[in-house]
């Protein structure tokens, strides 16, 4: 269950919706009242939806899934990048490029191009066999690609789920996810249609503190899912469908020696996982 209280949500301003004249009637079920022309969101219902979203993300990751974090509005960029990086999940915090999901093969080629450019030494004019101008242009290309695609550089396949801040602004991302059958968890304000996502979280999607709180919470769900995934693999003595990456192992610093039996490793790993579980920021 998500570790969040009503007090946390109130302090973060998650109960403030948009002006009443800008509302979407489909959000009526999540609106408590209105004050000074502003809709007030029913945070009791928000808490229920948060728990559902949290459990979904945790379960998805525990079953070897990945979650793509998306938030390109100014208020969300830092939280999206920081929290996704914390649990080593892919993210998009700059402009969403059309086809990032539906044309993933082409996007992957651009990511590979980025990795190629990162291997170059742009200060070695003589060794590269290129002119200073050519190296400068290539370096600019690298910087541009990194800004656009750096967050998904390690995403080798389309994600299992997507977490979105502001589905109105990220309408294209949500649309692409739906075309591929990818479930979406999203912060949904009073001006949006909650029916367009599978796991809506009714809340203010403009307040920086609120965005940070919910994004951090979803990252915690990912971390919990990673620990559960590792624990299940050890208990059953089976390899995961996908090998654990180095960054996942770093989350488990108290991992038992590989040569120990599965029965002996499971209790020790459980203690280590509890001690190392990331805290909400």
From Swiss-Prot:
Record keywords: Ribonucleoprotein, Ribosomal protein
GO biological process, alphabetically ordered: translation
Listed Gene3D superfamilies: Glucose-6-phosphate isomerase like protein, domain 1 (3.40.50.10490), Helix hairpin bin (1.10.287.610)
CDD domains noted in UniProt: RPS2
GO cellular component, one term: cytosolic small ribosomal subunit
InterPro entries for the chain: Ribosomal_uS2 (IPR001865), Ribosomal_uS2_bac/mit/plastid (IPR005706), Ribosomal_uS2_CS (IPR018130), Ribosomal_uS2_flav_dom_sf (IPR023591)
Pfam families hit by this protein: Ribosomal_S2 (PF00318)
Gene Ontology MF term list: structural constituent of ribosome
Family that this chain belongs to: Belongs to the universal ribosomal protein uS2 family.
Protein name per Swiss-Prot or TrEMBL: Small ribosomal subunit protein uS2
Organism: Bifidobacterium longum (strain NCC 2705)
Origin organism lineage: Bacteria, Bacillati, Actinomycetota, Actinomycetes, Bifidobacteriales
Recorded name of the encoding gene: rpsB
